[in-house]
Regions:
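Small-residue (G/A/S/T)-rich helix-start motifs and N-terminal tracts that mark the onset
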Residues: 1-83, 88-90, 164-203
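Short, basic, glycine/proline-bearing loop/turn elements
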Residues: 23, 40-43, 67-72, 95-101, ...
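Hydrophobic transmembrane alpha-helix bundles
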Residues: 66, 88-96, 132-144
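Glycine/small-residue-rich loop that forms an oxyanion/phosphate-binding "nest" at active or ligand-binding sites
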Residues: 70, 78-127
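Conserved phosphate/ATP/ADP-binding segment of small-molecule kinases
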Residues: 107-192
Length: 203
């Protein structure tokens, strides 16, 4: 059972540590959310840098504490940038976040996501359809991935329907999985928590 008071204290402690250390978390993200992602990182006390080139992604991993990889807008150069950044983080033992936006749109996106499996992200964040498709694509839960069910950034599944897929992903990566929605699901593969701080706009 989750101790909600202890959880709150842990969140406060984490925020205080971020503000005290001002960690660098690089981002390779889509063009739609560049400003929002950078400002969110700055708002909690971190330091942000948004890059595109392969060597820049690797450099940010080397000099920073983590990296965020959002697959929403894929440029041809990302075929090198994204896997190299993920590999650099994995090899350095640094956490990285995978946001598999639009999984199922085009062969490049699908192949990149398959390649990223070996680097085990510390956090996976996606809507219900993306999480279900990712677990299927990685062969972790249920039948083979039905990528036709993923409609860009929109979900065709409920958060609760993604529960088993989220747990399977978290157990494989050894990290955490967040299924976004009006009520968000968060799991480490053992414990499942529901957060009522989400938004229907995140579905």
């Amino acid at each position: 059972m989750i101790d909600s008071e202890q959880l709150k204290q842990n969140v406060v402690k984490a925020v205080e540590e971020i503000r005290a250390t001002n960690p660098m978390a690089g981002s390779i993200t889509n063009t739609v959310t560049l400003d929002f992602v950078a400002n969110a990182q700055l708002a909690v006390g971190g330091s942000a840098a948004m890059v595109y080139l392969p060597d820049e992604g690797e450099a940010l991993v080397a000099g920073g504490g983590a990296i965020y990889l959002n697959m929403g807008t894929l440029f041809p150069i990302y075929e090198q940038t994204i896997p190299r950044a993920a590999k650099a983080a994995h090899d350095a033992g640094k956490p990285w976040v995978l946001d598999p936006v639009g999984l199922g749109i085009g062969s490049l996106r699908t192949q990149l996501v398959i390649e990223l499996k070996q680097y085990k992200p510390a956090i996976v964040r996606g809507n219900a359809s993306e999480i279900i498709a990712l677990a299927g694509l990685w062969g972790l839960e249920g039948e083979a991935a039905d990528l036709s069910r993923v409609r860009g950034v929109d979900t065709t599944d409920t958060v609760d329907a993604a529960r088993d897929a989220a747990v399977a992903l978290a157990r494989y990566t050894g990290g955490a999985v967040v299924v976004s929605g009006e009520v968000e699901l968060i799991t480490d593969g053992t414990t499942v928590a529901m957060s009522h701080g989400g938004s229907p706009l995140m579905s």
